[in-house]
Amino acid sequence: GLWAVINNAGIGGAAGPTPWLITEDFRAAMNVNFFPLVEISTRFLPLLESANGRIINMASVLGRFSFQGLAPYVSSKYAVEGMSDAYRRCLKPHGVSVHLIEPGFFKTNITNIVENKRRFMQVWTRLNSRLKNQYPLTIVQKYTAGLSAKMDKLCSSDVSKVVSAYERAVTDLRPRARYVVGYDAKYIFLVLQALPEWISDYLMTRVDMKP
């Protein structure tokens, strides 16, 4: 048998306002962040059943509260959340438990400032002339500079908290369904999620890039 399967692969994917994005941007994120998770979990399910094992899936707090500009990534993490909830309820009678790791912002390759600027610019360069006129390069550069400064303050460098959550999900006698990791996840994003949509929408659109 097999005690635990940990699904941890992930990419940030294409970044930019929704009008910039195309179907392939969403497909690319799903092809790494979601579909392999389903395939691996299904493939190892017989071994997990024989050991009353666990599936631990890397999601994100952005799988519970959306962040504009990252729609492909956010969509893939919402898919991970939904799949994990469905699997958890379905597999419980089979002796298999399913658990989610939901980090906030940590300093990783996905949140790397240089990489995020590159992803924004990569999408901007393919836009047609109408969208480039709506979103001039000067506005994009100003927005990405401001976003980088905010991300630098928001991101925690203590990734050991995420590792600790994995360890607990694997070894806890009574593991949680969700392990929310990081102060921003617990005290910013989940608070925003609990607010009425008109309030959270107002707060989030104040930091959005406007044409």
State what each model feature region is.
Residues V5-I6, I55:
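Conserved hydrophobic beta-strands of the Rossmann-like cofactor-binding core
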Residues S41-T42, D85:
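A short, exposed helix-loop element centered on a Lys and neighboring polar residues
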Residues S41, S76-A79:
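Active-site helix of classical SDR
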Residues F65, A86-S97:
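Active-site-adjacent segment of SDR/Rossmann-fold oxidoreductases
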Residues P93-R176:
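SDR active-site lid
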Residues G12-R27, G69-P72:
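Conserved mid-core segment of classical short-chain dehydrogenase/reductases
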Residues S60:
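Residue(s) in the substrate-gating loop at a strand-loop-helix junction
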